[in-house]
């Protein structure tokens, strides 16, 4: 099984903005070590993991415009080899009163744009790439085990430009409905579109119960994604504080189905 853990936190500093951090960990589990000689396995096991740690700053300049940026450290490990990189995310959000039934900017059309993973290249290095080499195996009198190293290739991070639009066709004291659509332009795949809908049912004295659904990777040449669905519960307490519990289901094609669980606290 593949397990992913995401942990994040943020704090609002008056007059400064929002400061946040996040850690994403991916564990691909244990796998058998194989070689050309022992293709069924040597009896050893190895693990592969990924880690991304981010530091984020964002600020609302005016009531209708906000921006943010994240500095990320990314590291990938396979057995005794690892690769690392630094990357930057940049984004802006514009709230307009277009299609706003209340006349408020936050209830109108929201337009967002972002650039993700603008950073350095990655390259695997480690003791697994060290191998003894006989540079002249058919000649006598030379060193038979010269220290050598396989030089792995470099690769770029998946740079993604994204633009999205969201509207609220229904805004009331008991229910909000939001429809969103994103267009993606990555450097390592074809362009695609994500779309989704969220129905928030407001329960007086309790909180909010949300139902969500969407479609991912529309118009991608070879999509490996399908339908997404989920729900969320927000329980309010002590005025403006809340506990949030969310569940999401995602179809990932050849990798099967993914189930995601989130617990959050706002105070």
Task: Mark where each language-model region is.
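Subset of outer-membrane beta-barrel
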Residues: 1-267
